[in-house]
Amino acid sequence: SGKILLNKERIDLINYLQEHVLSRDDIYFDETQIENYIAFSEKWYFPLDNWEKFIAPFIFLYFKEDDELFYEEFFITLGRGGGKNGFISTLSNYFISPLHGINNYDVSVVANSEDQAKVSFKEVFNTIDGNPKLEGSFDAWKAQIVGKGTNSVFKFQTSNAKTKDGGREGCVIYDETHEYEDRQIIDVFSGGLGKVANPREFFIGTNGFVRAGFYDKLEERSKAILSGENLNDRMFPFICKLDDPEEVKNEAMWEKANPAFEKPLSPRSKRLLNKVRKQYEALKNNPSGREAFMTKRMNLPEVDLEKVVAPWKDILATNREMPELQNRACIGA
């Protein structure tokens, strides 16, 4: 039928874009960049999913006045297996290519572990390595990939803020943002942005088990943007999740959390759906796995009430400023 199921946050995003972005007359889409990115990705990597083609134009949205980016930050969260890393692989390779055309536009992908940071890097490396046409435009080494025409470098980094200094990146991609307890590492890398034209940051991940961390703060920002409460915050929030835990019982609802399940299914999506279906069926004999399944596959953390003293929203409600204690007496026993 051509129809897709959307969760509330994506419906809100479409309404927000129609009301507050697409109605503006001081911005423009760079159609050449959009078409070049899609053509580059589909020639050397894979057909882009509809959700990737939906986001892509907003990556190349500019102000008419000075050709600066309208969106410099993107928050992309969906159920595990949806293709987030593939998307950032294509973007990273395109950004260092002559088609993008910005000299010294370095790209770093940052994650908590080296293995995760290397996921997209390896995909780009393997795509270039042994391909004579791509090897003519890129030097692929084990630690970095260089776009010859623009002298732009793509590399992976781990998120140990104590050992990092902000570089001169054009783009930083923060993977597995659900594991970040605070924004310390973001502050390190974002400090190097802006020295090169068109600075971009991508926050990628699926929900996790760290509460009140950086991921939750991104969700709070997204809510304020989509509600119209903070229209000055130009972050693009693309959030895919179930609206209600009960929806997990209806497999047709799963595409709310993972757009890879939109019809028609690609061969890769069919394999993924079969895997997720088996995991869901296994919960009948292993109910303790439900919390992880809901968090990672449905992108909707579900609290196990048997393990929790107080619900998280009740804990947050107790937050209050500490009183001034200086020069007050301290009594101990």
Regions found by a protein language model. Name each.
Residues S1-A333:
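Phosphate/NTP-binding elements of NTP-utilizing enzymes
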